[in-house]
Amino acid sequence: MARVKRAKNARKNHKKVLKLAKGYYGGKSKLFKTANESVIRALRNSYVGRKNKKRDYRRLWIARINAATRINGLSYSKFMNGIKLAGIDINRKMLSEIAINDAKAFADLVEVAKKQLNA
C-alpha cells in the first residue's frame, strides 16, 4: 500500500469543502470532487453578485429619479446638471428616497434645478 504523506491536510481540506457544500443536492454535498466544483462556482458567483449589486442599485436609483423628475417636467440629465450648478451635493440614493417618500421636497429640488438651468 502506498504511503500517504498529507492525510491530515487532505482530510482537513475535504472537511472544509464538504462543510461549505452542506445543503447542496445529492452528490454535490457528499462527494468531494463535485462538492468542490460546486463550492468554487458558488463562491465565484457570490463574489460577482456583490459587485453587480452596486451597479443594480445605482441603476434603480437613477430610474426612480428619472421618473420623478419627468413628472415634474424635467429630464434626469438636466435635473442632475441643475442640482450640481446649484451646489446641492446629494447622492443618488438619497435623491431616490426623497422622490419616493417626500414628493413635495423633491418638487422643490426640481424647481431649484430649473432656476439654475435658466439662469
Swiss-Prot record:
SUPFAM superfamilies: Ribosomal protein L20 (SSF74731). Keywords: Ribonucleoprotein, Ribosomal protein, RNA-binding, rRNA-binding. It holds the Pfam family Ribosomal_L20. GO terms for cellular component: ribonucleoprotein complex; ribosome. InterPro entries: Ribosomal_bL20 (IPR005813), RIBOSOMAL_L20_CS (IPR049946), Ribosomal_protein_bL20_C (IPR035566). GO terms for molecular function: rRNA binding; structural constituent of ribosome. The keyword Ribosomal protein applies. GO terms for biological process: ribosomal large subunit assembly; translation. Binds directly to 23S ribosomal RNA and is necessary for the in vitro assembly process of the 50S ribosomal subunit. It is not involved in the protein synthesizing functions of that subunit. NCBIfam families: rplT_bact (TIGR01032). Belongs to the bacterial ribosomal protein bL20 family. This is Large ribosomal subunit protein bL20. It comes from Clostridium botulinum (strain Eklund 17B / Type B). The gene is rplT.
